[in-house]
């Protein structure tokens, strides 16, 4: 996908309007505990450029405040097909508020640990993990065996 200068500007502007919320009340130690280092616009744009289109379901399993999902929507993704999982309840609330302005239903954004398979129970039955047919957008540190969703039970 080619990301136009106009879209780059929109992504940067949208990011900057929420940046003050991202670290609100969180010390560096707390952010390190949850792995909270949010994706800057430059990296988000590079990730968008890797996609041919954004017509499918998009899951960000470490969505934070929703910056990557917001950028996908600004680039044309269907907000109702955008999903996120976040470990920190405070950050998840910021994400829900941020993405509701872009049309993402709050029930598409879930509290949970993406490394455990139990957090995926919230998603509609039509949601697929078929990596041959769906593009899976992973933002953050992925488990060693990315598609073994129950791997953490056997550590």
Name every feature range the model reports, one short phrase each:
Residues 1-155:
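SAM-dependent methyltransferase catalytic region
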